[in-house]
């Protein structure tokens, strides 16, 4: 079983960069949400462990589902039926797997059911997904538009 996160040591290295301490503390508002949300980290090590575990899940889904569907998705493509776009079967399967795993809204605040991830681990997740299927990453990656809105 392929995992597009655990097989790439460069990605794991990024999480341990010294600036991540400052970035995470800022994003987590000095870990002030730890009493409000059950899954909010209590300190940097807890946050870093969370990012690592989530990226491992993204890597597993990307390596075993998204990459496996990529060829057929390209062959099938999306369809326009009754003025509605219908994704290729594999695209829908990819998206459903990431939704089921809670990987939509990664960078959104917890109050909007997001994971409150800093941009660095979110971009790392996008790199992992794009390795499996760059076209699908375009669809999955639109989730950060919610921050702009």
Regions found by a protein language model. Give the residues of each.
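Extended, charge-enriched "interface" segments that sit outside catalytic cores
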Residues: 1-81, 85
């Amino acid at each position: 079983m392929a995992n597009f996160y655990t097989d790439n040591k460069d990605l794991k290295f990024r999480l341990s960069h010294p600036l991540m301490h400052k970035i995470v503390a800022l994003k987590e508002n000095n870990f002030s949400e730890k009493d409000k949300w059950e899954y909010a980290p209590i300190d940097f090590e807890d946050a870093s462990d969370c990012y690592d575990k989530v990226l491992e899940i993204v890597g597993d889904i990307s390596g075993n589902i998204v990459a496996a569907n990529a060829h057929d998705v390209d062959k099938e493509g999306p369809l326009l039926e009754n003025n509605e776009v219908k994704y290729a079967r594999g695209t829908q399967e990819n998206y459903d797997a990431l939704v089921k795993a809670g990987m939509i809204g990664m960078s959104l605040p917890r109050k909007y059911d997001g994971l409150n991830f800093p941009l660095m681990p979110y971009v790392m997740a996008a790199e992992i997904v794009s390795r499996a299927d760059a076209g699908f990453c375009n669809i999955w990656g639109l989730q950060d538009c919610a921050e702009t809105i």
